[in-house]
Swiss-Prot record:
The gene is GLT6D1. Its cofactor is Mn(2+). The chain crosses the membrane at residues 7-23. Substrate binds at residues 82-87, 173-175, 195-198. Keywords: Glycoprotein, Glycosyltransferase, Membrane, Signal-anchor, Transferase, Transmembrane, Transmembrane helix. This is Putative glycosyltransferase 6 domain-containing protein 1. Residues 24-276 are lumenal.
């Protein structure tokens, strides 16, 4: 009996050693903000919010540390872009070319391209890390305003398949191009972009929605930053949560005879749900 007990104890101890070794080799070490973010290098700008989220500027982050972390996580990043009419012809091709060159280079990326008509993808050098998926939005929806169609369509695709395909997702406007690397320093649960013009203005002058009956209303004397509408990012779950809140806000405003902009609803969401 003693020999059997001894054998069981030895086997149990050996099993614990195997489990410990597995987790030591496979567990991704949690990344601390101080490991890669160096706000003191840019004393000329705001580098941290009141809720201690980093505000990224060139020179404030160490991409090498982040690369080491995310390589081990084996992530996939999604980039959704929406273009209709002249936007598809004029902006979408240069956007995709620049994104293919600068967006999350070295990582798996799925481009979700949503258009209102047939769109031929530009000639882009094939890569096993790059996947392009085009979706046609039904023409019966075009009585709605553009941003509403974009957001609603994106929400449907997130719920049906995107949330199972990517770890992080960005939604961007097509009328812009990437000039430099847009890398893993931008990843986080909820990511916003400061408005380039309003950043340098007084908070009290921000063009928030001020009508009290609007779902997008931020009362006078409140608010922290003004965010631009060219980009929103985060986990698919958080993007879907924003979309639901935005659509509910639009419905609320329509019932009250109001018509606030997408950007103002976006700012209200980020006012209540702070970017990370």
């Amino acid at each position: 009996m003693n020999s059997k007990r001894m054998l069981l104890l030895v086997l149990f101890a050996f099993s614990l050693m195997l489990v410990e070794r597995y987790f030591r080799n496979h567990q991704v070490e949690e990344l601390r903000l101080s490991d890669w973010f160096h706000p003191r290098k840019r004393p000329d700008v705001i580098t941290k919010t009141d809720w201690l989220a980093p505000v990224l500027w060139e020179g404030t982050f160490d991409r090498r540390v982040l690369e080491k972390h995310y390589r081990r996580r084996n992530i996939t990043v999604g980039l959704a872009v929406f273009a209709t009419g002249r936007f598809a012809e004029e902006y979408l091709r240069p956007f995709l070319h620049s994104a293919n060159k600068h967006f999350m280079t070295g990582y798996r990326v799925i481009f979700y391209i949503m258009v209102d008509a047939f769109f031929k993808l530009p000639d882009i050098e094939p890569s096993p890390l790059r996947t392009f998926k085009a979706f046609k939005v039904g023409t019966e929806r075009w009585w709605l305003d553009g941003p509403l169609v974009h957001v609603k369509s994106l929400g449907e695709h997130i719920a049906s398949h995107i949330q199972d395909e990517v770890d992080f997702l960005f939604s961007m406007a097509a009328n812009q191009v990437f000039q430099n690397e847009f890398g893993v320093e931008t990843l986080g649960p909820l990511v916003a972009q400061l408005h380039a013009w309003w950043y340098f203005r007084n908070t009290k002058n921000f063009p928030y929605e001020r009508r009290p009956t609007s779902a997008a209303c931020i009362p006078f004397g409140q608010g922290d930053f003004y965010y631009g509408n060219l980009m929103v990012g985060g986990t698919p779950h958080n993007i879907l949560d924003f979309i639901k809140e935005y659509l509910n806000g639009v419905i609320h405003d329509i019932k009250n005879g109001l018509n606030s902009t997408y950007e103002k609803h976006l700012n209200k969401y980020f006012y209540l749900n702070k970017p990370t």
